[in-house]
């Protein structure tokens, strides 16, 4: 009964909210089959991965960088992944006229493929790369088709649009600005272990006074920063919310 009541309350909150902000992490994409790179058995468990994905390594050895980049993110098979029920749910909220912005730590681009229009890619995206000289952009298929992708105009080795270790977060200020405007913050599928994103729930609740909602299979240690906590997969949460009439 309490669980049903929580769903009812959250549904009403979303109906009344003027501005909804959603923070998503790996759990938003694992239901599409994408591995959680930060899990115990994930690719980030390799001690060398941070070095291979660093700005310094790209600058020193761009050809070797691209070899490891493609292996780590398995980009040759990335087309197989499709948006799941959670991605579609957020796009549907937007289609209903809600002012919704997604702040995602994911680099897979599935929110955009799922038709969400207002997405801030905090850690960049695997879907594109660009020429460091002329800034011409290239898509995922171009990266797949070329062992070491180069600009067709300048012949420079492309720069991936993923935020590398050693980079700043170019979208951080835009994310903070949105947090201070929001009525509701929904955190979905993230363990909230990586700063500065881990501070977002506290900012939303303590400084902004927004209603905060957590949807994550495992506890994060930040439950005190949330008004509602759903220890579920995102798909389960969406189905529970959809069942409330």
Swiss-Prot record:
Q: Does the keyword Zinc apply?
A: yes
- Which residues are listed for nicotinamide binding in this entry? 37, 107-108
What is the uppermost EC class here?
transferase
Catalytic reactions of this protein: N(6)-acetyl-L-lysyl-[protein] + NAD(+) + H2O = 2''-O-acetyl-ADP-D-ribose + nicotinamide + L-lysyl-[protein]
At the top level, the lineage of the source is Bacteria
Name its co-factor(s): Zn(2+)
Please tell me whether the keyword Metal-binding is annotated for this protein: yes
User: What are the binding positions for NAD(+) in this chain?
Assistant: 26, 30, 37-38, 105, 107-108, 123, 190-191, 216, 234
* Entry-linked Gene3D superfamilies: SIR2/SIRT2 'Small Domain, TPP-binding domain
Main location group:
cytoplasm
Q: Where in the cell is it found?
A: Cytoplasm
EC number(s) on file: 2.3.1.286
- Active site residues per record: 123 (proton acceptor)
- What residue stretches are annotated with the Deacetylase sirtuin-type domain? 1-245
Q: Which GO terms describe its cellular component?
A: cytoplasm
Q: Which UniProt keywords apply?
A: Cytoplasm, Metal-binding, NAD, Transferase, Zinc
This entry's comment on the bound cofactor is: Binds 1 zinc ion per subunit.
Binding locations of Zn(2+): 131, 134, 151, 154
Q: What does this protein do?
A: NAD-dependent protein deacetylase which modulates the activities of several enzymes which are inactive in their acetylated form.
Spell out the HAMAP family in the cross-references.
Sirtuin_ClassU
Protein family membership: Belongs to the sirtuin family. Class U subfamily.
Q: What is this protein called?
A: NAD-dependent protein deacetylase
The organism of origin for this protein: Bacillus thuringiensis subsp. konkukian (strain 97-27)
Upper classification of the organism: Bacteria, Bacillati, Bacillota, Bacilli, Bacillales
Underlying gene = cobB
């Amino acid at each position: 009964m309490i669980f049903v009541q929580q769903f009812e309350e959250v549904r009403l909150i979303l109906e009344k909210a003027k501005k909804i902000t959603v923070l998503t992490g790996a759990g938003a994409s694992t239901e599409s089959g994408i591995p959680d790179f930060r899990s115990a058995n994930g690719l980030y468990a390799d001690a060398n991965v941070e070095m291979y994905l660093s700005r310094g390594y790209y600058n020193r050895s761009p050809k070797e960088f691209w070899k490891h980049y493609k292996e780590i993110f398995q980009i040759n098979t990335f087309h197989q992944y499709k948006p799941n029920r959670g991605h579609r749910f957020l796009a549907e909220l937007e289609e209903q006229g809600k002012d919704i912005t997604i702040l995602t730590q994911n680099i897979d681009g599935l929110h955009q493929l799922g038709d969400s229009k207002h997405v801030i890619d905090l850690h960049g995206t695997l879907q594109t790369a660009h020429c460091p000289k002329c800034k011409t952009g290239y898509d995922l298929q171009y990266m797949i088709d070329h062992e070491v992708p180069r600009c067709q105009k300048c012949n420079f080795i492309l720069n991936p649009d993923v935020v590398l270790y050693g980079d700043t977060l170019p979208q951080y200020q835009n994310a903070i600005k949105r947090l201070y405007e929001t009525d509701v913050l929904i955190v979905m599928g993230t363990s909230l272990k990586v700063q500065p994103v881990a501070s977002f729930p506290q900012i939303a609740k303590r400084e902004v006074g927004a209603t905060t909602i957590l949807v994550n299979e495992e506890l994060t240690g930040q439950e005190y920063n949330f008004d509602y906590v759903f220890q579920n997969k995102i798909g389960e949460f969406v189905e529970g919310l959809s069942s409330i009439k």
